[in-house]
């Protein structure tokens, strides 16, 4: 189920609480990932930031995958095993879990499905809205911002294809571009992914804090973190 972030009048919360909590995702202890967030548009705002952070998470996973794909020599099954292992630790999340499944998935002819998917990412707007909100608040939401721009960049297919012909891969300055990652290198990628996720969440919560102070929402960040766990 989903993580649900209702806002609005607190007097309406008891009328819809049971309905919303019954369809929400559940934590290991059975508690629902759904609580009243705050008055007015607090719920919508927190959901927007949640989706913005998710944009960041997906970009981080994509960059980690790209680095592993180019530097380990592993096929998609091997890469899927790495993400499956990562999902057993601090990186445990829905996105890491489905990344492993996607990497393992094969079509009927034995081809990896992922290898036939165009590297273009669309968007529904919540990532962009989060970045716009951060600009309005004067708060640095740098990681989500770069994730949104990466999606814009992915849509420039013709430009990227021309650039790849004009500037073929090989060396970047004096740095060799074909260094193979060993076990410790793979672990370093995992650590970098984890650190970047922490930065993204810290920036997201900072943005919510500023908006809460300006709008008088009195957001409960502990509750928000709890219902985001799934």
Provide a role label for each language-model segment.
Residues 1-2, 25-55, 73-91, 96, ...:
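Conserved Rossmann-fold dehydrogenase catalytic segment
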Residues 1-9, 13:
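Rossmann-like NAD(P)(H) cofactor-binding subdomain of soluble oxidoreductases
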Residues 9, 18-29, 51-54, 58, ...:
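Generic secondary-structure signature for well-ordered alpha-helical cores
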Residues 13-16, 79, 144:
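Small-residue helix-packing motif on alpha-helices
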Residues 56-59, 121-128, 199:
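Short acidic alpha-helix initiation/capping motifs at coil-to-helix transition points
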Residues 62:
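Extracellular and organelle-lumenal recognition/adhesion modules and their flexible linkers in secreted
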Residues 118-120, 126-137, 143-152, 171-172, ...:
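Long, well-ordered alpha/beta core segments of mature domains
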Residues 132, 145, 152-155, 166-172, ...:
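A SIS-like phosphosugar-recognition module
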């Amino acid at each position: 189920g989903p993580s649900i972030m209702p806002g609005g009048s607190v007097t309406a919360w008891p009328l819809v609480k049971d309905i919303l909590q019954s369809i929400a995702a559940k934590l290991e202890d059975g508690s629902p990932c759904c609580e009243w967030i705050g008055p007015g548009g607090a719920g919508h705002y927190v959901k927007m930031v949640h989706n913005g952070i998710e944009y960041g998470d997906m970009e981080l996973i994509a960059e980690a995958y790209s680095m592993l794909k180019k530097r380990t020599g592993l096929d998609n099954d091997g890469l899927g095993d790495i993400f499956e292992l990562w999902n057993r630790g601090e990186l445990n999340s829905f996105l890491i879990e489905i990344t492993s499944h996607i990497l393992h998935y094969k079509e009927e002819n034995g081809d990896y499905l992922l290898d036939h998917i165009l590297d273009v990412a669309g968007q529904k707007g919540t990532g962009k809205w989060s970045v716009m909100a951060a600009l309005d608040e004067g708060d640095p939401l740098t990681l989500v911002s770069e994730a949104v721009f990466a999606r814009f960049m992915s849509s420039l297919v013709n430009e990227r294809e021309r650039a790849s012909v004009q500037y073929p891969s090989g060396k970047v300055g004096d740095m060799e571009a074909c260094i193979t990652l060993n076990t410790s290198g793979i672990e370093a990628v995992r650590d970098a992914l984890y650190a970047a996720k922490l930065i993204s969440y810290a920036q997201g919560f900072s943005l919510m804090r500023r908006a809460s102070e300006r709008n008088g929402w009195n957001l409960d960040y502990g509750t928000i973190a709890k219902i985001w766990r799934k």
